[in-house]
């Protein structure tokens, strides 16, 4: 059940994407007390397909999905990119792991300096583009969830969100980790042809740092090691361009 203002805004977003033939859930019904019923997407979540045999999807189909977002998305309210809050997230992580303060300060400085002066962007964006939101089938993208975050921004923000999430997956065995590295090695060069490679990595690192707050907040049994691995991933992204 959604508050009235949020309900109307969410309904309008679904209607906008339906009219543009974006493969997102369709509105199956609404109630007077603001319940919204959506159709189920076909295919499988990318988060599962990543670890199944075969190619889950192509990088081109991921970019193509974002290209289907209609220009009217840019008329919606703007959401701040993760990189604007990198100092905040660095402080949160450092509060849990004080010995990482210097590394985090360095990363925040490089990200902020590297992205300073870039315009906000006026491209249609999803706003939270990661493997849990994307559905795939037969090696192609077939749907996208959680469209309430759509709005204007930079394409690099969406692609960076996906790269960051894939770079920080936890609880993988060695074969799964190898597969993830291979997927990233195949996808990122395609993303680099669409957005600036330096911007992509800096924004990816910023998203990764925001994800580094998760293990401590959820009190994972091995939260320290998990947090450190995410910090390492963020630093590796930065070191590719710094």
Regions found by a protein language model. Give the residues of each.
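Short, contiguous acidic/charged loop-to-helix segments that flank catalytic cores in large enzymes
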Residues: 1-5, 50-57, 119-121, 147-153, ...
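ATP-binding pocket architecture of kinase catalytic cores
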Residues: 1-80
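Regulatory N- and C-terminal appendages and interdomain linkers associated
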Residues: 9-12, 32-33, 98-106, 215-242
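Feature representing long, continuous alpha-helical segments
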Residues: 25, 36, 60, 64, ...
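Active-site acidic catalytic loop and adjacent metal/ATP-binding pocket
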Residues: 36, 114-157
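An alpha-helical support segment within catalytic cores of ATP-dependent transferases
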Residues: 74-126, 193
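Active-site activation/catalytic loop segments of kinase-like enzymes and analogous catalytic loops
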Residues: 156-192, 206-223
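Rossmann-like AdoMet/SAM-dependent catalytic core
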Residues: 198-205
